[in-house]
C-alpha cells in the first residue's frame, strides 16, 4: 500500500471569483464539480487568473463534492476551480492505473462518508489515502486490460443506444 501523495502530485483548484462567471464562450471554460464526469463546461470565466490553473486535454480530475468522480478532461485551456483537483502521476506510476485504482477508492470513500446535504472530500482525506500499487510493469498490464474492457463497454453502450433509438423510431 502506498499513500496517494507518494505516487502522484495533487493540485487543488483555485477559488475563482463568481462575479466573473459567464456563459460567454469567448472566455476560458471553468471546470466545476458537475463538469468533471462529462468532460466539458458551459460556464466560463471573464476575470484574471493564475496560469498554473489552466488545464490540458487529458488531465486527470477528481470532483470533491457530491459524487466523487474521477475522469480525464476533454479540452485544452479550461480553468481548475475549487473543489476539483488534478492528479499528476509521479515517475513509476501509470496514470491510467491510477485512474482505475482511484475510481474504486473514491467509491469506497463516498460509501462511508456521512453527509447532511452534500458529501465533501477533504484534501486531508486525499493526502492520507492509501492505494495498492504493484510494480510499474504490472500497473501497465492492468491498465491496458482495463482500458480495453472500458472501450468494449463504451461500444456496447453505444450499440444499445442505437437499438433503443431504432425501437423508438418504429413506433
Show which residues each predicted segment covers.
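Short, solvent-exposed loop/turn positions at domain surfaces
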Residues: 48-49, 115, 154
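A short beta-sheet element
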Residues: 32, 51-103
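Histidine kinase transmitter module recognition
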Residues: 90, 101, 152-155, 159
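Non-catalytic DNA-recognition/assembly elements of restriction-modification systems
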Residues: 1-15, 128-147, 154-170
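Sequence-specific dsDNA recognition surfaces
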Residues: 5-20, 27-57
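Short amphipathic beta-strand starts and helix->beta connectors
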Residues: 71, 112-115
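A short glycine-rich beta-alpha junction/loop motif
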Residues: 2, 12, 78-85, 115-137
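Short amphipathic alpha-helical signal-transduction/dimerization elements
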Residues: 102-110, 150
Amino acid at each position: 500500500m502506498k499513500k496517494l501523495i507518494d505516487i502522484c502530485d495533487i493540485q487543488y483548484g483555485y477559488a475563482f471569483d463568481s462575479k466573473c462567471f459567464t456563459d460567454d464562450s469567448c472566455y476560458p471554460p471553468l471546470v466545476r464539480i458537475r463538469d468533471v464526469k462529462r468532460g466539458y463546461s458551459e460556464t466560463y470565466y471573464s476575470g484574471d487568473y493564475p496560469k498554473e490553473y489552466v488545464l490540458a486535454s487529458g488531465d486527470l480530475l477528481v470532483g470533491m463534492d457530491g459524487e466523487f468522480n474521477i475522469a480525464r478532461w476533454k479540452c485544452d485551456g479550461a480553468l481548475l476551480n475549487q473543489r476539483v483537483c488534478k492528479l499528476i502521476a509521479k515517475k513509476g506510476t501509470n496514470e491510467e492505473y491510477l485512474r482505475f485504482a482511484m475510481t474504486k477508492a473514491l467509491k469506497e470513500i463516498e460509501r462511508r462518508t456521512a453527509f447532511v446535504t452534500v458529501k465533501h472530500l477533504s484534501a486531508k482525506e486525499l493526502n492520507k489515502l492509501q492505494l495498492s500499487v504493484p510494480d510499474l510493469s504490472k500497473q501497465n498490464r492492468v491498465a491496458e486490460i482495463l482500458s480495453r474492457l472500458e472501450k468494449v463497454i463504451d461500444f456496447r453502450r453505444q450499440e444499445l443506444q442505437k437499438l433503443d433509438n431504432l425501437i423508438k423510431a418504429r413506433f
